[in-house]
Amino acid sequence: MRLIRSGAAQVRGEAERRGRPSRVAMLSMHTSPMEQPGTGDAGGLNVYVVELSRQLAALGVEVEVFTRAVSSKLPTSAELLPGVTVRHVDAGPFEEIHREDLPAWLCAFTAALLRAEAGHEPGWFDVIHSHYWLSGQVGLAVAQRWGIPLVHTSHTLAKIKNGALAVGDRPEPPGRLLGEQEVIGGATRLLASTPDEYRHLIDLYDAASDRVDVVAPGVDLEVFRPGDMAQSRARVGVDPADDLLLFVGRIQPLKAPDLLLRAAAELLRRDPARRSRLTVAVVGGPSGSGLEQPDALVKLAAYLGISDRVRFQPPAPQQELVHWYRAATAVVVPSHSESFGLVALEAQACGTPVVAAAVGGLRTAVADGVSGLLVSGRTPAVYADALDRLLRQPRWRARLSAGAVAWAGGFGWSATAHGVLRSYRHALSPTAVAV
């Protein structure tokens, strides 16, 4: 049963008659779209929220993104983009809180969100779109209070992560498993990024297949596009003659940057003459259970005897990151699991082949043998084999580069927004199941 605030039912009916929402409340409790991807809890989810909101606004849908305030100096609201407002919600101390500790502040976030919305006219929002299970928990409560549908994107699934844990990584706690199950069971519509995730939601979480929409994330094809490799190498300080192997992302066990370092060491063991022309770059910052990882990676590089061939760079904004992609000979994505893998898509859009783990969404993001290589197995040797093939065959690499641009070209954010908007329309349908 819905608890519908006075006036909300009439406005909801208007949205149903229009067949599309006018305003969407986007929930991203644990990480702000204004944060720099690649550090802390900021990553692909942040990019997703920003770019989806941008495209929805371009389609005439107003978006308000609600996120937890981590500083008293943050404004209550800020315009992120035309038609997109970020609301900083007071819930818990004004500081970063480990994601594992955030469930304690769900009630406070929910209450603050309800207070913030009370300043609007009744029925202001037509749809709630929650991101990650924490926001989904808030979304369930708020959707019932407002009498509007909840659309949920998981981004990652605890059961999948726990089934592919890295050494030194912590399993997702029982509280998340239970909370995630509740959100998946209670949302009006679910968005899956890939056919794999669609099957996981149905097979592992008992989601009804007719409530799940498959909509792939996108890439900003205006920013991430081919460019002059020599110019980009000069900008990031890489020798024009080097083979550059690039890792981009949060430094945490799940992303497995250590596997790239071990594979590079294996390449040099097999061919010591390659040493003078091989560079490995790791662009990103620590996150979650990987807080000790940067120091550990530095020590690992020293242990492997490749410190002189490895560069550690802080997270870079898109305008700088694009030059790293263009400068790279190959981008390596050796993750234990990925719901999609936006880094792989961004790299390919720049014309750089990707060598990625054959897991999860990477099997959708990378076309094996067309835009890059998918690697089965998690040993340094199998990654070294794939990288060696790529480095020794420049003509084949050039074909992969062309294939990468063509493949990524099919993943624009505009297509993502239209797919999400279709899901919103389904959620607004009079036949949609109530939260």
UniProtKB/Swiss-Prot annotation:
An annotated GO BP: mycothiol biosynthetic process
Binding site for 1D-myo-inositol 3-phosphate: H30, D41, A42, G43, G44, L45, N46, R99, Y132, T156, R176
Region of interest called Disordered, as start-end residue ranges on this chain: 1-23
Enzyme class per UniProt: transferase
Keywords for the protein's UniProt record, in alphabetical order: Glycosyltransferase, Magnesium, Metal-binding, Transferase
Family: Belongs to the glycosyltransferase group 1 family. MshA subfamily.
PANTHER family per UniProt: SULFOQUINOVOSYL TRANSFERASE SQD2
The protein, known as: D-inositol 3-phosphate glycosyltransferase
UniProt source species: Frankia casuarinae (strain DSM 45818 / CECT 9043 / HFP020203 / CcI3)
